[in-house]
Amino acid sequence: MRLRTSLGVASACASVASAALKVTEDNSTITLANDRLTSTFAKDKGRVSELFLDGQDLLGPISGNTGVGPYLDCYCIPSGFYTAGSTDPRLEVVQGTDSTGTKYAGVILNDTYTPTGQQFQQYWFLRDGETGLHTFSRLAYYNETTPFLRNLQEFRTLFRPNTELWTHLTSSEAQTAPLPSKEAIANEVVVQDATWRFNNTPNDAYYTQFSEYFTKYTFSNCMGLFKTYWYAASANLQ
């Protein structure tokens, strides 16, 4: 009863099955699909806007910056955060056969942050017979006059579902916890930057099973592998 999604600068998650790879495109979207996984990309945003596995909606409805992904985000422009595709997203479809003889189809996002000339690329690939997307990210900056803009921080691929399907977060076989409930989040206490305390909801599953505190760094012990694993509440997703 587990769906394993691998996200990051270079990542993959796959389970081999018989499939027929298809690519469709219209004025607003590009869709990659095989017999099990369907991924739709919004051309005006440069990101995945729909993701279905065996008919199950993995993202839920779009609401702000949730219900979308995977997409590329970073803390790398002079003002701070930037989402690739926010300036001038250009999507390109690629298709071919890899060295194993397996067919693949992909979407490549190209975007340039105009004020600095920083160039962003995000790649998504779907192989015939697999149940996950392969992703790869690139950032380039060429400027001899101003060779240093700021530190490159949080260059990351984000997956932000907006559905009750997802119940747990884990970064390794040894570290797993239930997601904090909506009540716990509503009553959280800010401790410091990106760190919260759930002492107001001591009966919450996250509090009782894992920790009184939550920080965005809690599940970063596997960053060397650039992997994050999510557990799903629905059956028959494996």
Curated annotation (Swiss-Prot):
<dbReference type="GO" id="GO:0000272">
    <property type="term" value="P:polysaccharide catabolic process"/>
</dbReference>
<dbReference type="GO" id="GO:0005576">
    <property type="term" value="C:extracellular region"/>
</dbReference>
<keyword id="KW-0456">Lyase</keyword>
<comment type="function">
    <text>Pectinolytic enzymes consist of four classes of enzymes: pectin lyase, polygalacturonase, pectin methylesterase and rhamnogalacturonase. Degrades the rhamnogalacturonan I (RG-I) backbone of pectin.</text>
</comment>
<feature type="signal peptide">
    <location>
        <begin position="1"/>
        <end position="19"/>
    </location>
</feature>
<dbReference type="GO" id="GO:0030246">
    <property type="term" value="F:carbohydrate binding"/>
</dbReference>
<feature type="glycosylation site" description="N-linked (GlcNAc...) asparagine">
    <location>
        <position position="27"/>
    </location>
</feature>
<protein>
    <recommendedName>
        <fullName>Probable rhamnogalacturonate lyase B</fullName>
        <ecNumber>4.2.2.23</ecNumber>
    </recommendedName>
</protein>
<keyword id="KW-0964">Secreted</keyword>
<dbReference type="InterPro" id="IPR011013">
    <property type="entry name" value="Gal_mutarotase_sf_dom"/>
</dbReference>
<comment type="similarity">
    <text>Belongs to the polysaccharide lyase 4 family.</text>
</comment>
<feature type="glycosylation site" description="N-linked (GlcNAc...) asparagine">
    <location>
        <position position="143"/>
    </location>
</feature>
<feature type="glycosylation site" description="N-linked (GlcNAc...) asparagine">
    <location>
        <position position="110"/>
    </location>
</feature>
<keyword id="KW-0624">Polysaccharide degradation</keyword>
<keyword id="KW-0961">Cell wall biogenesis/degradation</keyword>
<dbReference type="GO" id="GO:0071555">
    <property type="term" value="P:cell wall organization"/>
</dbReference>
<keyword id="KW-0732">Signal</keyword>
<dbReference type="GO" id="GO:0102210">
    <property type="term" value="F:rhamnogalacturonan endolyase activity"/>
</dbReference>
<keyword id="KW-0119">Carbohydrate metabolism</keyword>
<keyword id="KW-0325">Glycoprotein</keyword>
